Amino acid sequence: QGLYWFDTQPSVAKAARDHAEQLREDPDTAWNEIVRRLKAAEGKGRGFFSHIHIAPDTAADIPDMDTVRLVIVHPRLRRRKNDGAESEVVKWIRAAVESKGAAQRTHRNTLVFLVADSDELERLENTTRNYLGWKMVQDSAEQLNLSKQQSNQADSWVNRLNDTINSNIRSTYMWMLYPEQVDPTRPFELVAEKTSDSDGKTLTERVFTKIKRDGQLITELAPTMLGMTLHSELGALWDRVDDMTVGDLWGYFTQYAYMPRLASRTVLDDALRSVIDVMLMPGEQFALATGKDEEGHYQGLILPPSSAATPPVVTDNTLVVKWEVAKAQLDADDALEAAYEDGEVIMASDHSETTIVSWPASRVTVVNNDAVSGVGVSEAEASSTAAVELPDIHYTGSVVIKSDRYVRMVNNIIEEVIDR
């Protein structure tokens, strides 16, 4: 006769498997476990972005701030390789960029998103359910009356699946998305780039490295690039104004997706402070001022480069001034100063006789072919002078350059002599 033996202890593998299957009907439980791990691993990654927003339930949970932040999208939203504008995750991200709840979002150029890959997420969800199944068995060892061997088996599976989940999260969250607007007259597009998990970095560091390498997050801004931005991306506005405050300029960087994405306000301030040492070319030129009086006269005006200037203290009220406007004021200031000074002279010669005339040329006065300095000429003397048109002959000349105003004086020479 056959003998049969019945094990009175439950099969721990079957108990874990049954619980994991039940969780298929409750996806929130697995998602909550994934989110918990994301917060534990990525919540301290603010050294790369000003803030990390992990799995916000709605776009209203993402603050409208003027600093660049990373949004790790909730695992209920996933991206397939060929997803278009009508996919659920793309529509959610677009809505998050455009609005914060019922209000329009102001700082649209400050958000970067990280999204799970659809295929990888399915594997992660399955692993997470299996982990939770074995975790239930481990936590219920006493109630299930598990043997020492069964408890060890549960512990082994929990540890193994725990490590697998952490590894799978890194390979699952691979899609970086951010708004880009090539044409300011058209709506922004969402650019999707895959990030690599081959370098052992956290998700936050991986995204930061990728977006910085792609030139989509600027951590250091050269003054020349800032000048080019004023003349190109902001050209339509820059052409209509004489100046703008740094506070307004920073707002343009954070609001519009066609502007470079600066990592922080410090990046802009550093570029402005360092411009005093940089020779700017046409298409890059701008000046700085601490303010302007009621008559529109700029105060603390700096026309780069300026060896005599000290790095300015940049505030929201600091003015970025159009180069031509700043130069016109400085030229007028120099002309007024020169009216009371001697020594800035040009030695001009027509190879027959030498004539001494004052600088700048706009103040040259000639009386009976004898040039006199415009400096200190009285109204009576000026009324008795007669302007004489010099013959079209060859002239040579020299000018004394002051070290504290060499840029403006050289520019004057170029405009008055070379460009004429």
Model-assigned labels for residue ranges:
Residues 1-419:
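Extended alpha-helical scaffold and adjacent linker segments that couple domains
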